[in-house]
């Protein structure tokens, strides 16, 4: 029983640390003079199936973390913290979008594999800047591959694509007044 308790405490501290790191990065991406509103978003089953088919990527968890970023009560962006499966372990990444649904920054928050960590390289991630729901996320065409990191490259690219799809959905729902 004690072991289970310690595992839960340890897992909770890891999640809190990842969320704290994500929020620090969000503040660096959007500036210090912004308001950040956190939402643990649980897509309904129909939405989840749609997102998985559209992005060709299954969700690892039932929820994702979403932040609405506002300045003077005006929405300026949405950030999404999500996980994709690398070769065998999750890759936790953050995608920051402007209010038009275009990516302004991406960041690998936690990379757990021994190989393929190059997907966390800022220069590689910068090629996604400006991508949105209508962008072509094809590896080798608009996105450079990384030798030795094929699985991670595909996973992160599909993850950012799914984030763009989610942001488009959230922006549309926000205009309608709800998620």
Question: What kind of feature is each model-predicted range?
Answer:
Residues 3-13:
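Sec-dependent N-terminal signal peptides
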Residues 17-143, 150, 154, 158-179:
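Flexible, solvent-exposed loop/hinge segments and secondary-structure transition points
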């Amino acid at each position: 029983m004690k072991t289970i308790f310690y595992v839960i405490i340890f897992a909770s501290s890891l999640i809190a640390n990842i969320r704290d790191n994500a929020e620090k990065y969000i503040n660096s991406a959007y500036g210090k003079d912004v308001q950040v509103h956190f939402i643990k978003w649980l897509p309904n089953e129909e939405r989840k199936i749609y997102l998985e088919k559209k992005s060709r990527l299954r969700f690892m968890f039932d929820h994702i973390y979403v932040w609405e970023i506002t300045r003077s009560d005006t929405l300026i962006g949405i950030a999404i913290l999500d996980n994709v499966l690398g070769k065998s372990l999750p890759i936790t990444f953050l995608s920051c979008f402007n209010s038009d649904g275009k990516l302004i920054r991406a960041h690998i928050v936690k990379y757990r594999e021994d190989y393929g960590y190059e997907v966390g390289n800022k220069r590689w991630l910068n090629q996604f800047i400006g991508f949105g729901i209508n962008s072509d996320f094809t590896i080798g065409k608009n996105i450079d591959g990384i030798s030795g990191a094929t699985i991670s490259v595909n996973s992160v690219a599909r993850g950012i694509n799914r984030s763009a799809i989610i942001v488009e959905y959230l922006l549309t729902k926000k205009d309608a007044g709800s998620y």
